[in-house]
Structures are given as structure tokens and as C-alpha cells.
Amino acid sequence: MEPLAILALLSLPICSAYPLHGAVTQGHPSMDLAQQYLEKYYNFKKNEKQIFKRKDSSPVVKKIQEMQKFLGLEMTGKLDSNTMELMHKPRCGVPDVGGFSTFPGSPKWRKSHITYRIVNYTPDLPRQSVDSAIEKALKVWEEVTPLTFSRISEGEADIMISFAVGEHGDFYPFDGPGQSLAHAYPPGPGFYGDVHFDDDEKWTLAPSGTNLFLVAAHELGHSLGLFHSDKKESLMYPVYRFSTSPANFHLSQDDIEGIQSLYGAGPSSDATVVPVLSVSPRPETPDKCDPALSFDSVSTLRGEVLFFKDRYFWRRSHWNPEPEFHLISAFWPTLPSDLDAAYEAHNTDSVLIFKGSQFWAVRGNEVQAGYPKGIHTLGFPPTVKKIDAAVFEKEKKKTYFFVGDKYWRFDETRHVMDKGFPRQITDDFPGIEPQVDAVLHEFGFFYFFRGSSQFEFDPNARTVTHILKSNSWLLC
């Protein structure tokens, strides 16, 4: 997902109609809202030089049309009253873009019996009413799959359900009443599968306020692995609306086909199981102990080591050697996947992340303002189109950039490339063959990753001391 948790939606005044051709200018509140909405839910990449061109082909027009198509609006490409009205409605914050009805990689529970725990309660409803709403929301999915659910009262469940306000420890703070209602994570270990409700909402079991049963059933669909649907009748349609009470509620055929593509039909279900061949091919979730596993890039981050692969990364720390597995978008929603290179710049407490001719700076879970920037701002010649690997040597305060069979050295103190570079990799790192996938500097050694192998290089002896599997860092 692509986050896979909900991102905040800012609420701004509605205006009747704001076509892009002349009526909306940069800084107009409706344009600001539209830009924020498209960035969060439609993967819109801000480009100051292009956003406000008054042409039908401008990126913002195309993204507005994409949003209008997905949400079932007339594709005007303009911020008309219907579009603005929908942007202001409460909704789920999982992005709407995506090629499939399930999350990328099709994460799902690898078992049929799933536990859940209600960690705390909203003051808006009696505890037994909350218990009943959650139970009925799970029953919706249980009726059409082989899945069963049971509640536990202590310890860690597969799905941890809680109510919170504002900052609540997962990088996605809630935004107050009437906007983002809740968020959920796809199946997996740790916080994956969990559901968080914004307790600033007025939770009810009625058409007024925000109906807990309907929101819970939607979010639990995410917890089971479903993405958003563009069908308005679907429970997984992203915009909130009250439809009916639990007693009269039935999943749409779109919801049934989506969940059964992951788990199959339940023994008593009359619904049609989606044939495997009808589902578009999906990228595989990488297995950390696959003997052929390679990494896109590797970096340290505040005492941890991050291993990036496709849209995922493993996170290993000295105090917790068991690697954690995450989606890149769960921590940095605006970063691309399939990264080229990454390294930690200790002097700025940031990690620089490279893809193609651009790079981003992240500090903690925040992408820094003013990025992405072009790699040529670092001093590379125009002939360099991308970086293969990068690593920071803390003792010398130098960063090494590897491109093809050459490498550059960057002075992090003076912020310039050192003179005399590029140099041949094999001249200064004997035994290291180009092209390098990733480099890590730990324990006084350089670790060069190439395919499924890594080469431990001693810079003092100028020799390769060990050849290991790339995933040996992941306890494989």
C-alpha cells in the first residue's frame, strides 16, 4: 500500500467551481487542498514548474481526472463543485492508486484462524456496543471466506484494535473530527494488521455521527489484505457514507471477489470464487532467506541497518537482531520504490536516497522539504544518469559513490567532490568487480553487495577477506 496507513486530509472551505484554466491560481486554498489530496491519495509528484501551467495536459489536470475516474465523477479535470465536495468528505486515507484490488504483493494471513484484541474503548459508546460492532464487522468477512476470528483479552493479537487522537506512535497522526476516520495496516507481523480509530470522531451505531460498524468493516478489509475499490457500492470504496445497519448489510460482489482472490470461498458461501487466472500478476513479496536474494540498496539509520528491496525494506538493529519487514511507503509515503542507492550522512542526521537522476533526504520518518534534488547538484558530470551504490565512511567524513566501473568521493564537510575523481573501482578496491548493487561500512570493513553475494573488504589490507551471502545479515 502503498501506506499503508491513513494519511491526514486537511479540511478547507468549499468553493462552487474552480476550473484550472485561469480561475485557480497558486496559493488558492482550493488548489492547496487539491494538491494535498492528490499527493496523499493519487501519488501526485509536485513539480513547481509544471503544476500551474494552464494546459489540459498539465500533471495536476491529469491527476484530477484520474481521481474523478476512480471516484465515479465526470472527468472534467477541473476543481468543480462535485469534485471539491468529494474531497471534503470523510474517507479512508489509504491511497486510491494501485493496479490491484489487493495491496501490492498481495499480503495475506498465512492461516485461517486470526485473533484480535480491542486494546481500549471510545467514550462515545458502551463497551459492549463496541465489542458487538467489531464482532459484526469481522462476521462480514467470515461469512464469505474460510477465515475465523476469536478475541483475546491480553497479549499480542494478530489484529490489535485501538482508539487514539493526534500523535499515537505510528507516524500517522490523526487530524481531528470529520476528516480521516481511521487507518489500518495490511497483514503481517508487528503493527501490520492493526486498526486505529480516530477518537476525535463521534462514534455511533446510527446513521448520524460516524457509524463504527461500517468503518470497522472497511478497515478490517485492509487488515485482511484488500485495497480500495472504485465501485461506489463496494464496502472498500474509500469515501465514507452510511448505507445500512449491520442486520441488513451485505458485501458487494466486488468485495466478495476481492477477498476470495486471497483466501477462497467459505464452506457455506454461495459466492463465486475468483479464478486464479483472472487476477493480474502481482509482484512477489521477497523472502529474506531466498538464496538468490539481492538488495537494491543498503544504509544505516541511527544505529540500525536498512536493506531495501523493491517496495520493501528490512530493518535490523544491534539491540534487536531479529529483522523487521516493512513497506517503504509505510514510513515514507512519498518515496519511490526500487531504489538505486542510499547512505546515512551522520553530520546532518539524515539518509540520502537515490533513484534515477534524483535524490531525497529523510530524517527519521520525514522527507525533508526542498526534495527531490538532481544528483548533478552534488557535482556529478552530465554523463552520470544514476548512482549504483553509495556509502559514508564516518571516520573520514567521506561518501563514496559507485557508478559502473568507477567511483567518486564526496567531502561531507566541504560539500564538494574531492579532486582526482572518478577513479577505477578495481584500482582502490582490488577484488571488487563492477557493477556494485549496494555498499555498507560497518566494523571497519566495507561490505560490497553484488547479486546474492557480498564481499567483505578490509581497507587497511586492501583485500577481500570473506565472501558471504547477501542475506546473512538477516539471520539466514
UniProtKB/Swiss-Prot annotation:
- For this protein, the Enzyme Commission number is 3.4.24.22
Removed propeptide positions: 18-99
* Key word Metal-binding present: yes
Induction info reads: By wounding.
Binding locations of Zn(2+):
92
Mention any Pfam family matching this sequence.
Hemopexin
List all disulphide bridges recorded for this chain. 289-476
* Record-annotated active site: 219
Tell me the Gene3D superfamilies matching this sequence: Collagenase (Catalytic Domain), Hemopexin-like domain
According to its UniProt entry, the function of this protein is described as: Can degrade fibronectin, gelatins of type I, III, IV, and V; weakly collagens III, IV, and V. Activates procollagenase.
What's the domain remark here? The conserved cysteine present in the cysteine-switch motif binds the catalytic zinc ion, thus inhibiting the enzyme. The dissociation of the cysteine from the zinc ion upon the activation-peptide release activates the enzyme.
* Name of this protein: Stromelysin-2
| Gene name of the encoded protein | Mmp10
